[in-house]
Amino acid sequence: MSSSNNQPNFAPFRDEKNNSLVVILGAQWGDEGKGKIVDLLASQADIVCRCQGGNNAGHTVVANGKTYHFHLLPSGIIQSNCTSVIGNGVVIHLPGLFAEIEAIEKNGVQDCWSKLKISDRAHLVFDFHQEADGLLELEKGDSKIGTTKKGIGPAYSTKASRVGLRVCDLMGDFEDFTKKFKNLVKGYRKRFSELEVDVEKELERYKRYADIIRPSIEDTVFFLSEELKKGNKNIIVEGANAVMLDLDFGTYPYVTSSSCGIGGVCTGLGLPPSTIRNVVGICKAYITRVGAGDFPTFLDSDIGTKLQDIGQEFGTTTGRRRRCGWLDIVVLDYVNRISGLTSIAVTKLDVMDTFEEVKIGTAYIHNGQKLKSFPADHSILSEVEVEYITMPGWKQNISLCRKFSDLPENAQAYILKIEELSGIPVQFVGVGKSRDATIRRF
Protein backbone atom coordinates (compact mmCIF):
# COMPACT_ATOMS: atom_id res chain seq x y z
CA MET A 1 0.00 0.00 0.00
CA SER A 2 1.06 3.62 0.24
CA SER A 3 3.97 4.93 2.26
CA SER A 4 3.72 8.15 4.27
CA ASN A 5 4.56 10.31 1.25
CA ASN A 6 1.86 8.58 -0.83
CA GLN A 7 4.47 6.68 -2.85
CA PRO A 8 3.77 2.91 -2.86
CA ASN A 9 6.64 0.65 -1.85
CA PHE A 10 7.18 -1.13 -5.15
CA ALA A 11 10.30 -2.14 -7.08
CA PRO A 12 9.95 -3.27 -10.72
CA PHE A 13 10.92 -6.93 -11.00
CA ARG A 14 13.78 -8.14 -13.17
CA ASP A 15 14.72 -11.82 -13.39
CA GLU A 16 18.14 -13.38 -12.94
CA LYS A 17 19.04 -12.49 -16.53
CA ASN A 18 17.98 -8.90 -15.89
CA ASN A 19 14.91 -9.16 -18.14
CA SER A 20 11.79 -7.10 -17.53
CA LEU A 21 8.51 -8.56 -18.80
CA VAL A 22 5.50 -6.32 -18.21
CA VAL A 23 1.94 -7.35 -19.08
CA ILE A 24 -0.68 -4.65 -19.74
CA LEU A 25 -4.27 -5.82 -19.26
CA GLY A 26 -7.65 -4.13 -19.52
CA ALA A 27 -9.19 -4.26 -16.04
CA GLN A 28 -12.76 -3.36 -17.08
CA TRP A 29 -14.79 -4.00 -20.27
CA GLY A 30 -12.25 -2.59 -22.72
CA ASP A 31 -11.39 0.89 -24.02
CA GLU A 32 -9.47 1.70 -20.82
CA GLY A 33 -6.50 3.35 -22.52
CA LYS A 34 -4.14 0.38 -22.71
CA GLY A 35 -2.50 1.70 -25.88
CA LYS A 36 -1.45 4.91 -24.16
CA ILE A 37 0.30 3.10 -21.30
CA VAL A 38 1.96 0.66 -23.70
CA ASP A 39 3.16 3.60 -25.77
CA LEU A 40 4.52 5.29 -22.65
CA LEU A 41 6.54 2.19 -21.74
CA ALA A 42 7.44 1.18 -25.30
CA SER A 43 9.99 3.96 -25.72
CA GLN A 44 12.32 1.82 -23.60
CA ALA A 45 11.09 -1.58 -24.80
CA ASP A 46 12.93 -4.01 -27.03
CA ILE A 47 9.81 -6.01 -27.89
CA VAL A 48 6.06 -5.35 -27.71
CA CYS A 49 3.69 -8.31 -28.23
CA ARG A 50 0.02 -8.98 -28.93
CA CYS A 51 -1.11 -12.33 -27.53
CA GLN A 52 -4.83 -12.73 -28.33
CA GLY A 53 -7.86 -11.28 -30.08
CA GLY A 54 -7.88 -9.85 -33.56
CA ASN A 55 -8.83 -6.62 -35.27
CA ASN A 56 -11.90 -6.40 -33.04
CA ALA A 57 -9.56 -4.61 -30.63
CA GLY A 58 -9.06 -0.87 -30.89
CA HIS A 59 -6.16 0.97 -29.25
CA THR A 60 -5.62 4.70 -29.75
CA VAL A 61 -2.25 6.37 -29.15
CA VAL A 62 -1.59 10.12 -29.29
CA ALA A 63 2.14 10.76 -29.69
CA ASN A 64 4.33 13.38 -31.34
CA GLY A 65 1.26 15.42 -32.23
CA LYS A 66 -0.32 12.56 -34.17
CA THR A 67 -3.12 10.11 -33.46
CA TYR A 68 -2.64 6.43 -34.30
CA HIS A 69 -5.36 3.79 -34.33
CA PHE A 70 -4.33 0.17 -33.79
CA HIS A 71 -6.37 -2.99 -34.21
CA LEU A 72 -3.94 -5.86 -34.91
CA LEU A 73 -0.54 -4.21 -34.64
CA PRO A 74 1.12 -3.80 -31.24
CA SER A 75 1.30 -0.12 -30.27
CA GLY A 76 5.09 -0.41 -30.09
CA ILE A 77 5.26 -0.39 -33.90
CA ILE A 78 5.62 3.41 -33.84
CA GLN A 79 8.93 3.06 -31.98
CA SER A 80 11.92 2.90 -34.35
CA ASN A 81 14.00 0.43 -32.32
CA CYS A 82 11.25 -1.86 -31.08
CA THR A 83 10.29 -5.27 -32.50
CA SER A 84 6.54 -5.93 -32.66
CA VAL A 85 5.28 -9.49 -32.29
CA ILE A 86 1.85 -10.85 -33.24
CA GLY A 87 1.63 -14.08 -31.29
CA ASN A 88 0.09 -17.46 -31.97
CA GLY A 89 -3.03 -16.64 -29.93
CA VAL A 90 -4.02 -13.79 -32.27
CA VAL A 91 -6.42 -14.41 -35.16
CA ILE A 92 -5.27 -12.41 -38.17
CA HIS A 93 -7.41 -10.87 -40.90
CA LEU A 94 -4.71 -10.18 -43.48
CA PRO A 95 -6.70 -7.57 -45.48
CA GLY A 96 -7.24 -5.71 -42.21
CA LEU A 97 -3.54 -5.96 -41.32
CA PHE A 98 -2.50 -4.61 -44.72
CA ALA A 99 -4.94 -1.68 -44.41
CA GLU A 100 -3.74 -0.91 -40.89
CA ILE A 101 -0.07 -0.89 -41.89
CA GLU A 102 -0.85 1.34 -44.86
CA ALA A 103 -2.66 3.83 -42.60
CA ILE A 104 0.11 3.81 -39.98
CA GLU A 105 2.82 4.36 -42.60
CA LYS A 106 0.83 7.22 -44.15
CA ASN A 107 0.88 8.76 -40.67
CA GLY A 108 4.67 8.83 -40.71
CA VAL A 109 5.70 5.47 -39.22
CA GLN A 110 8.38 3.87 -41.37
CA ASP A 111 9.36 0.25 -42.09
CA CYS A 112 6.46 -1.45 -40.31
CA TRP A 113 7.02 -4.78 -42.03
CA SER A 114 10.71 -4.91 -41.12
CA LYS A 115 9.87 -4.34 -37.43
CA LEU A 116 7.07 -6.94 -37.36
CA LYS A 117 7.23 -10.65 -36.54
CA ILE A 118 4.10 -12.76 -37.06
CA SER A 119 3.69 -16.19 -35.50
CA ASP A 120 3.52 -19.06 -37.96
CA ARG A 121 1.03 -20.68 -35.56
CA ALA A 122 -1.50 -17.81 -35.65
CA HIS A 123 -4.88 -18.61 -37.22
CA LEU A 124 -6.31 -16.68 -40.16
CA VAL A 125 -9.60 -14.79 -40.29
CA PHE A 126 -11.21 -14.78 -43.73
CA ASP A 127 -13.87 -12.46 -45.12
CA PHE A 128 -16.45 -15.25 -44.90
CA HIS A 129 -15.76 -15.48 -41.15
CA GLN A 130 -16.77 -11.83 -40.91
CA GLU A 131 -19.88 -12.35 -43.01
CA ALA A 132 -20.83 -15.37 -40.89
CA ASP A 133 -20.30 -13.27 -37.76
CA GLY A 134 -22.94 -10.82 -38.96
CA LEU A 135 -25.35 -13.61 -39.90
CA LEU A 136 -24.97 -15.24 -36.48
CA GLU A 137 -25.72 -11.91 -34.82
CA LEU A 138 -28.90 -11.54 -36.91
CA GLU A 139 -30.01 -15.03 -35.87
CA LYS A 140 -29.83 -14.04 -32.21
CA GLY A 141 -32.46 -11.32 -32.65
CA ASP A 142 -33.09 -9.56 -29.34
CA SER A 143 -30.39 -11.70 -27.70
CA LYS A 144 -27.57 -10.34 -29.85
CA ILE A 145 -24.32 -9.71 -27.98
CA GLY A 146 -23.07 -6.67 -29.89
CA THR A 147 -20.27 -8.33 -31.83
CA THR A 148 -17.89 -6.14 -33.85
CA LYS A 149 -18.58 -8.45 -36.84
CA LYS A 150 -14.86 -8.83 -37.46
CA GLY A 151 -15.10 -12.61 -37.69
CA ILE A 152 -13.32 -13.23 -34.41
CA GLY A 153 -15.83 -15.68 -32.92
CA PRO A 154 -16.15 -17.79 -36.10
CA ALA A 155 -12.35 -17.85 -36.52
CA TYR A 156 -11.80 -19.08 -32.97
CA SER A 157 -14.63 -21.59 -33.52
CA THR A 158 -12.87 -23.10 -36.55
CA LYS A 159 -9.67 -23.15 -34.50
CA ALA A 160 -11.39 -25.08 -31.70
CA SER A 161 -12.99 -27.40 -34.27
CA ARG A 162 -9.49 -28.13 -35.63
CA VAL A 163 -10.38 -27.11 -39.18
CA GLY A 164 -8.89 -23.61 -39.09
CA LEU A 165 -6.09 -22.42 -41.36
CA ARG A 166 -2.90 -21.07 -39.83
CA VAL A 167 -0.20 -18.78 -41.15
CA CYS A 168 2.11 -21.78 -41.57
CA ASP A 169 -0.47 -23.32 -43.93
CA LEU A 170 -0.29 -20.20 -46.09
CA MET A 171 3.51 -20.34 -46.02
CA GLY A 172 3.54 -24.02 -47.04
CA ASP A 173 2.33 -25.91 -50.10
CA PHE A 174 -0.28 -23.64 -51.70
CA GLU A 175 -2.10 -26.59 -53.28
CA ASP A 176 -2.61 -28.02 -49.81
CA PHE A 177 -3.74 -24.59 -48.56
CA THR A 178 -6.20 -24.41 -51.47
CA LYS A 179 -7.70 -27.78 -50.59
CA LYS A 180 -8.13 -26.85 -46.92
CA PHE A 181 -9.57 -23.45 -47.81
CA LYS A 182 -12.17 -24.98 -50.15
CA ASN A 183 -13.17 -27.53 -47.50
CA LEU A 184 -13.57 -24.76 -44.93
CA VAL A 185 -15.74 -22.70 -47.29
CA LYS A 186 -17.81 -25.78 -48.09
CA GLY A 187 -18.52 -26.30 -44.39
CA TYR A 188 -19.55 -22.68 -43.91
CA ARG A 189 -21.84 -22.77 -46.94
CA LYS A 190 -23.63 -25.77 -45.46
CA ARG A 191 -24.27 -23.76 -42.32
CA PHE A 192 -25.02 -20.45 -44.07
CA SER A 193 -26.68 -20.98 -47.45
CA GLU A 194 -26.68 -17.23 -48.16
CA LEU A 195 -22.91 -16.95 -47.73
CA GLU A 196 -21.17 -15.57 -50.81
CA VAL A 197 -17.51 -16.48 -51.38
CA ASP A 198 -15.58 -16.06 -54.63
CA VAL A 199 -13.20 -18.92 -53.88
CA GLU A 200 -10.82 -18.43 -56.80
CA LYS A 201 -10.57 -14.69 -56.25
CA GLU A 202 -9.84 -15.22 -52.55
CA LEU A 203 -7.16 -17.81 -53.28
CA GLU A 204 -5.51 -15.50 -55.80
CA ARG A 205 -5.50 -12.73 -53.20
CA TYR A 206 -3.99 -14.93 -50.49
CA LYS A 207 -1.28 -16.14 -52.80
CA ARG A 208 -0.21 -12.50 -53.20
CA TYR A 209 -0.40 -11.95 -49.46
CA ALA A 210 1.84 -14.95 -48.84
CA ASP A 211 4.68 -13.45 -50.87
CA ILE A 212 4.44 -10.11 -49.06
CA ILE A 213 4.28 -11.37 -45.48
CA ARG A 214 6.76 -14.25 -45.83
CA PRO A 215 9.81 -12.27 -44.55
CA SER A 216 7.88 -11.36 -41.38
CA ILE A 217 6.78 -14.90 -40.50
CA GLU A 218 8.63 -16.55 -37.65
CA ASP A 219 8.40 -19.12 -34.89
CA THR A 220 7.73 -16.43 -32.31
CA VAL A 221 7.79 -18.92 -29.42
CA PHE A 222 11.42 -19.70 -30.24
CA PHE A 223 12.19 -16.03 -30.92
CA LEU A 224 10.88 -14.82 -27.53
CA SER A 225 12.55 -17.68 -25.67
CA GLU A 226 15.91 -16.89 -27.26
CA GLU A 227 15.56 -13.18 -26.56
CA LEU A 228 14.88 -13.90 -22.88
CA LYS A 229 17.92 -16.17 -22.77
CA LYS A 230 20.11 -13.31 -24.01
CA GLY A 231 19.08 -11.21 -21.03
CA ASN A 232 18.70 -7.46 -20.49
CA LYS A 233 15.46 -7.42 -22.51
CA ASN A 234 12.51 -5.12 -21.90
CA ILE A 235 9.39 -6.89 -23.16
CA ILE A 236 5.81 -5.60 -23.02
CA VAL A 237 2.75 -7.74 -23.65
CA GLU A 238 -0.22 -5.67 -24.79
CA GLY A 239 -3.47 -7.37 -23.87
CA ALA A 240 -6.44 -6.77 -26.14
CA ASN A 241 -10.10 -6.34 -25.14
CA ALA A 242 -10.26 -6.74 -21.32
CA VAL A 243 -10.49 -9.30 -18.54
CA MET A 244 -14.23 -8.65 -18.12
CA LEU A 245 -14.63 -9.72 -21.76
CA ASP A 246 -12.65 -12.94 -21.22
CA LEU A 247 -14.33 -16.05 -22.63
CA ASP A 248 -14.10 -17.89 -19.30
CA PHE A 249 -14.16 -15.14 -16.69
CA GLY A 250 -16.11 -12.34 -18.37
CA THR A 251 -19.84 -11.61 -18.28
CA TYR A 252 -20.71 -14.60 -20.48
CA PRO A 253 -22.20 -14.71 -23.09
CA TYR A 254 -21.49 -10.99 -23.56
CA VAL A 255 -17.79 -11.60 -24.02
CA THR A 256 -15.19 -11.97 -26.73
CA SER A 257 -13.87 -15.33 -27.94
CA SER A 258 -10.37 -15.35 -26.46
CA SER A 259 -8.60 -15.43 -23.10
CA CYS A 260 -8.02 -11.77 -22.21
CA GLY A 261 -6.43 -12.33 -18.80
CA ILE A 262 -2.99 -13.45 -17.69
CA GLY A 263 -3.64 -17.00 -18.93
CA GLY A 264 -4.02 -15.73 -22.48
CA VAL A 265 -0.54 -14.22 -22.29
CA CYS A 266 1.02 -17.63 -21.67
CA THR A 267 -1.05 -19.55 -24.22
CA GLY A 268 -1.01 -16.76 -26.79
CA LEU A 269 2.75 -16.30 -26.85
CA GLY A 270 4.16 -19.54 -25.47
CA LEU A 271 5.66 -17.74 -22.48
CA PRO A 272 6.19 -19.71 -19.25
CA PRO A 273 4.28 -18.18 -16.31
CA SER A 274 7.56 -17.82 -14.42
CA THR A 275 8.75 -15.15 -16.88
CA ILE A 276 5.92 -12.78 -15.86
CA ARG A 277 6.17 -10.61 -12.76
CA ASN A 278 4.71 -7.18 -13.51
CA VAL A 279 1.04 -7.10 -14.45
CA VAL A 280 -0.43 -3.62 -14.87
CA GLY A 281 -4.22 -3.38 -14.95
CA ILE A 282 -5.62 -0.41 -16.85
CA CYS A 283 -8.88 1.16 -15.71
CA LYS A 284 -10.63 4.43 -16.39
CA ALA A 285 -11.42 6.73 -13.49
CA TYR A 286 -15.01 5.79 -14.34
CA ILE A 287 -16.08 2.77 -16.41
CA THR A 288 -17.50 2.17 -19.88
CA ARG A 289 -18.93 -0.67 -21.88
CA VAL A 290 -19.71 -0.93 -25.60
CA GLY A 291 -22.24 -3.43 -26.90
CA ALA A 292 -24.68 -5.51 -24.87
CA GLY A 293 -24.17 -7.05 -21.44
CA ASP A 294 -24.73 -6.36 -17.76
CA PHE A 295 -23.23 -3.18 -16.33
CA PRO A 296 -24.09 -2.70 -12.62
CA THR A 297 -22.80 0.90 -12.23
CA PHE A 298 -24.24 2.12 -15.57
CA LEU A 299 -25.57 5.68 -15.41
CA ASP A 300 -28.70 5.99 -17.53
CA SER A 301 -28.84 9.69 -16.73
CA ASP A 302 -27.43 13.12 -17.55
CA ILE A 303 -24.30 12.20 -15.59
CA GLY A 304 -23.69 9.21 -17.86
CA THR A 305 -24.25 11.37 -20.93
CA LYS A 306 -21.84 13.97 -19.54
CA LEU A 307 -19.12 11.34 -19.09
CA GLN A 308 -19.84 10.09 -22.60
CA ASP A 309 -19.57 13.54 -24.16
CA ILE A 310 -16.54 14.85 -22.26
CA GLY A 311 -14.73 11.52 -22.54
CA GLN A 312 -15.60 11.21 -26.26
CA GLU A 313 -16.73 7.67 -25.60
CA PHE A 314 -17.07 6.18 -29.05
CA GLY A 315 -15.62 2.80 -30.04
CA THR A 316 -12.33 2.86 -32.02
CA THR A 317 -13.36 -0.23 -33.99
CA THR A 318 -17.13 0.25 -34.43
CA GLY A 319 -17.79 3.92 -33.68
CA ARG A 320 -20.60 2.91 -31.32
CA ARG A 321 -21.35 5.05 -28.27
CA ARG A 322 -20.07 3.53 -25.05
CA ARG A 323 -22.29 3.31 -22.00
CA CYS A 324 -20.73 5.06 -18.99
CA GLY A 325 -20.91 4.55 -15.24
CA TRP A 326 -19.09 5.05 -11.96
CA LEU A 327 -15.89 3.17 -11.18
CA ASP A 328 -16.65 -0.35 -9.93
CA ILE A 329 -14.33 -1.77 -7.25
CA VAL A 330 -16.12 -5.14 -7.33
CA VAL A 331 -15.02 -5.52 -10.96
CA LEU A 332 -11.48 -4.37 -10.18
CA ASP A 333 -11.18 -6.80 -7.26
CA TYR A 334 -12.42 -9.66 -9.44
CA VAL A 335 -9.92 -8.83 -12.19
CA ASN A 336 -7.13 -8.71 -9.61
CA ARG A 337 -8.05 -12.15 -8.27
CA ILE A 338 -7.85 -13.57 -11.80
CA SER A 339 -4.72 -11.82 -13.04
CA GLY A 340 -2.67 -10.88 -9.98
CA LEU A 341 -2.21 -7.19 -10.73
CA THR A 342 1.01 -5.70 -9.37
CA SER A 343 -0.19 -2.16 -10.07
CA ILE A 344 -2.91 -0.24 -11.89
CA ALA A 345 -3.12 2.76 -14.17
CA VAL A 346 -6.13 5.04 -13.71
CA THR A 347 -6.78 6.83 -17.00
CA LYS A 348 -8.98 9.78 -18.01
CA LEU A 349 -9.15 11.28 -14.54
CA ASP A 350 -9.44 14.68 -16.24
CA VAL A 351 -12.84 13.74 -17.71
CA MET A 352 -14.33 14.27 -14.24
CA ASP A 353 -12.78 17.72 -13.70
CA THR A 354 -16.14 19.52 -13.68
CA PHE A 355 -18.07 17.13 -11.44
CA GLU A 356 -19.39 18.40 -8.09
CA GLU A 357 -19.06 14.92 -6.65
CA VAL A 358 -17.85 11.51 -7.80
CA LYS A 359 -18.85 8.02 -6.74
CA ILE A 360 -17.21 4.61 -6.49
CA GLY A 361 -19.18 1.36 -6.46
CA THR A 362 -17.92 -0.76 -3.56
CA ALA A 363 -20.32 -3.72 -3.21
CA TYR A 364 -23.20 -5.59 -4.85
CA ILE A 365 -26.43 -6.28 -2.97
CA HIS A 366 -28.79 -9.06 -4.12
CA ASN A 367 -32.03 -9.94 -2.32
CA GLY A 368 -30.83 -7.87 0.63
CA GLN A 369 -27.55 -9.74 0.94
CA LYS A 370 -24.09 -8.38 0.14
CA LEU A 371 -22.41 -10.65 -2.41
CA LYS A 372 -18.96 -11.90 -1.44
CA SER A 373 -17.78 -12.33 -5.06
CA PHE A 374 -18.58 -11.33 -8.63
CA PRO A 375 -21.56 -13.44 -9.78
CA ALA A 376 -21.29 -15.78 -12.76
CA ASP A 377 -25.05 -15.92 -13.29
CA HIS A 378 -26.38 -13.25 -15.64
CA SER A 379 -29.78 -13.36 -13.94
CA ILE A 380 -28.18 -12.42 -10.61
CA LEU A 381 -25.83 -9.77 -12.03
CA SER A 382 -28.71 -8.07 -13.83
CA GLU A 383 -30.58 -7.66 -10.52
CA VAL A 384 -27.83 -6.43 -8.19
CA GLU A 385 -28.00 -3.08 -6.47
CA VAL A 386 -24.71 -1.23 -6.06
CA GLU A 387 -23.45 0.24 -2.81
CA TYR A 388 -21.55 3.48 -3.39
CA ILE A 389 -19.31 5.88 -1.55
CA THR A 390 -19.50 9.55 -2.56
CA MET A 391 -16.51 11.88 -2.66
CA PRO A 392 -16.22 15.61 -3.44
CA GLY A 393 -15.04 16.57 -6.92
CA TRP A 394 -12.02 18.78 -7.55
CA LYS A 395 -13.66 21.28 -9.91
CA GLN A 396 -10.50 22.37 -11.71
CA ASN A 397 -8.49 21.54 -14.81
CA ILE A 398 -5.84 18.89 -14.09
CA SER A 399 -4.60 18.37 -17.66
CA LEU A 400 -1.28 20.14 -16.99
CA CYS A 401 -0.48 18.21 -13.80
CA ARG A 402 2.64 16.06 -14.17
CA LYS A 403 3.31 15.09 -10.56
CA PHE A 404 0.93 13.51 -8.08
CA SER A 405 1.47 16.46 -5.75
CA ASP A 406 0.29 18.80 -8.54
CA LEU A 407 -3.20 17.29 -8.41
CA PRO A 408 -5.90 19.02 -6.34
CA GLU A 409 -6.34 17.51 -2.90
CA ASN A 410 -9.70 15.94 -3.80
CA ALA A 411 -8.27 14.33 -6.95
CA GLN A 412 -5.41 12.88 -4.89
CA ALA A 413 -7.94 11.60 -2.37
CA TYR A 414 -9.90 9.88 -5.14
CA ILE A 415 -6.81 8.03 -6.38
CA LEU A 416 -5.76 7.07 -2.85
CA LYS A 417 -9.28 5.79 -2.16
CA ILE A 418 -9.03 3.53 -5.23
CA GLU A 419 -5.76 2.20 -3.81
CA GLU A 420 -7.30 1.66 -0.39
CA LEU A 421 -10.42 -0.11 -1.66
CA SER A 422 -8.67 -2.30 -4.24
CA GLY A 423 -5.46 -3.01 -2.33
CA ILE A 424 -3.50 -2.36 -5.53
CA PRO A 425 -0.96 0.47 -5.89
CA VAL A 426 -1.81 3.08 -8.53
CA GLN A 427 1.32 3.45 -10.68
CA PHE A 428 0.01 5.76 -13.43
CA VAL A 429 -2.64 8.48 -13.54
CA GLY A 430 -3.84 9.73 -16.93
CA VAL A 431 -4.81 13.42 -17.14
CA GLY A 432 -5.15 13.85 -20.92
CA LYS A 433 -4.88 12.17 -24.29
CA SER A 434 -1.21 12.68 -25.09
CA ARG A 435 1.65 10.48 -23.94
CA ASP A 436 3.08 13.19 -21.68
CA ALA A 437 -0.27 13.80 -19.97
CA THR A 438 0.50 10.99 -17.55
CA ILE A 439 1.59 11.06 -13.93
CA ARG A 440 3.96 8.22 -13.04
CA ARG A 441 4.10 7.65 -9.29
CA PHE A 442 6.78 4.93 -9.26
Curated annotation (Swiss-Prot):
Binding locations of IMP: D31, E32, G33, K34, N56, A57, G58, H59, T148, R162, N241, T256, R320
Matching PROSITE patterns: ADENYLOSUCCIN_SYN_1, ADENYLOSUCCIN_SYN_2
GO molecular function: adenylosuccinate synthase activity; GTP binding; magnesium ion binding
Record note on cofactor: Binds 1 Mg(2+) ion per subunit.
InterPro entries: Adenylosuccin_syn_GTP-bd (IPR018220), Adenylosuccin_syn_Lys_AS (IPR033128), Adenylosuccinate_synth_dom1 (IPR042109), Adenylosuccinate_synth_dom2 (IPR042110), Adenylosuccinate_synth_dom3 (IPR042111), Adenylosuccinate_synthetase (IPR001114), P-loop_NTPase (IPR027417)
The enzyme's E.C. designation: 6.3.4.4
Annotated Mg(2+) binding sites: D31, G58
Highest taxon of the lineage: Eukaryota
UniProt-annotated catalytic positions: D31, H59
Top EC class of this enzyme: ligase
Binding site for GTP: 30-36, 58-60, 322, 348-350, 430-432
Role summary: Plays an important role in the de novo pathway and in the salvage pathway of purine nucleotide biosynthesis. Catalyzes the first committed step in the biosynthesis of AMP from IMP.
NCBIfam families assigned to the protein according to its UniProt record, in alphabetical order: PRK01117.1, purA
Name of the protein in question: Adenylosuccinate synthetase
Organism: Trichoplax adhaerens (Trichoplax reptans)
